[in-house]
Amino acid sequence: KRSEPNRTPSDVAIMVSEAVELAEIELRRRNVRLSHYVAARLPKLLVDPILIEQVLVNLMKNAAESIDHAKRATARRSVELRVIPRQLDGQSVVEFSVMDSGQGLAPEVMERLYEAFFSTKAEGMGIGLNLCRTIVESHQGRMQAENIYNGLDVIGCRFSFWIPLSDATNSIVTPNSSGAGVSA
C-alpha cells in the first residue's frame, strides 16, 4: 500500500522558493534563465511540501533539459514558473505551471508521457513524470502537458498541475463562538 502524503498546511511561496533554489543549480549549469511568479496572498495548501517541491524541481529540470536538447540560443533559454489561484469547475485550486522554450513534445511522446519507465533521455530511469503525476493525484490534483505554439510552430511546452484548496485550508483560522480567531 502506498503511504499517504504527510500533509500539513503549507505556504506556497516557501515551497516555490525552496524548489527554485534546488532547481537553479541545474538550470545555471545549462545556462537557462529561470523566472518565477507567485500570486500574492495565496491560501496555505494542505499538502506534503517535500513532495510538491519534488514535483516542481523535476518539472523545472525537465524544462531545462528540453531547452538544452533544442540547442536554443542564449536569448531563448528560459523557464518560467507561475503559481496562481484558479476556479476549475466551481472548485478553487492553486495552479502551478512550468513553461519552457524547448522543442515541445512530439505526439507519440505526449501519449506515453506518464508511463512508468518511459523516457526520451539517454540517462534517467523514466520515473520522473510518472512519479510526479502520482504525487499530484495523491493530493487530489491533476497534471497536464501541452505544447506552446506561435502560429504553427511549437516554441515550447507547458507542464501544469493544480492542487485543490481543501475545506480545511480555507478554515485554518475560524472564528469560534466568541468571535475570536482560533488556529486549527
PLM feature spans:
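A conserved beta-strand-to-alpha-helix junction within the catalytic ATP-binding
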Residues: T8-V20
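Conserved micro-motifs of the catalytic ATP-binding
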Residues: K1-P5, K44-V47, T120
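Glycine-rich ATP-binding loops of the HATPase_c
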Residues: Q140-N150
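A residue-level detector for a conserved hydrophobic packing site
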Residues: I52-E53
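ATP-lid-like helix-loop hinge signature
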Residues: A64-S92, I148-D153
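Conserved catalytic submotifs in the C-terminal HATPase_c
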Residues: R28, R33-P43
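Short conserved segment of the HATPase_c
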Residues: L105-F117
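Detector for a conserved hydrophobic position within an alpha-helical segment of the HATPase_c
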Residues: V136-E137
